Amino acid sequence: MERLLFLDACVRGPELSRTWRLCQRFLEEYTTLHPQAQVCHRDLRESLPILTGELARQRDGWIARGEDDPRLTPAREIASADLVVVGAPYWDLSFPAVLKVYLEWSSALGITFRYAEDGRQVGLSQARALVYLTSAGGPVEGQNYGFDYLKALGAMFGIPHAYCVAAEGLDIQGTNVQAVLRRAGDRAAALARQLAQEPMCLQG
C-alpha cells in the first residue's frame, strides 16, 4: 500500500486558506485514481518545539540508542513515505515557520540521510516525488524560494523529483480570484493524475 504524506501548513485553516483548496483538489484526484493509497495528514499548526541545540543533541542520542521518541516522527514519516505533498502559502518569499520547524526535525542523520565514506550525503527516503502546492497574493516572479529549498532538501533526503503548482496574484486588484484558483486547481489535478497513473515512470 502506497503511503502519501500530506504536510499541511495551511495556517489559516480549511475555511479561509486558498492553498488548502489546491491541496484538496490534488488529494481528491489522486485518491480517486489511486484508492489504495494511505493518506497521512499532518496538520503542522499542531506545532513541534523549535529544534534548539539541546534538543538536537537529545535527538542524536535517541537515534544512536535506537529509541523511538515521538519527536522523531517527522523524520520517520519522510523516510517511509512514497509520495510527499506539501501545502503552504507563499509568505515572505518562502513559507510559514511551522513548516520549517517540521523540516528541521525531519533532517535526522541515520533516518532521512547518512554520510558515505567519502563524505557525500546519501538520502534514505523512499519517496519517489515531492509536490509543493502554494498560493500567493502577488506574483512570485522567479522568487519561489520555499520551493527551491524544499526541492534541494528533498534531493538531500533522496527524493528524486519535485513539482510545484502555484496560484499567483490573488490579492492584486481586479484579479478574478476564482478563475485563478480554478486554473491552478486544474494543474494540481493534472499533476495528481500523472503521479497516480505513472508511479514508477516519472519525468521531472
Task: Locate predicted features.
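Short, solvent-exposed loop/turn segments at secondary-structure boundaries
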Residues: 15-18, 142-144, 175-179
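Glycine-rich phosphate/pyrophosphate-binding loop and the adjoining helix
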Residues: 147-204
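Short, glycine-/small-residue-rich phosphate/pyrophosphate-handling segment
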Residues: 116-159
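Structural beta-sheet core signal
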Residues: 6, 86, 130-132, 164
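Hydrophobic alpha-helical membrane-association signature
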Residues: 22-26, 146, 184
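N-terminal beta1-alpha1-beta2 submodule of the flavodoxin-like/Rossmannoid cofactor-binding fold
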Residues: 1-88, 93-104, 108, 189-204
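Flexible, glycine-rich phosphate/dinucleotide-binding loops
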Residues: 13, 48, 139, 171-173
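Residue-level signal for short, function-critical loop segments
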Residues: 10-11, 90, 136-138, 168
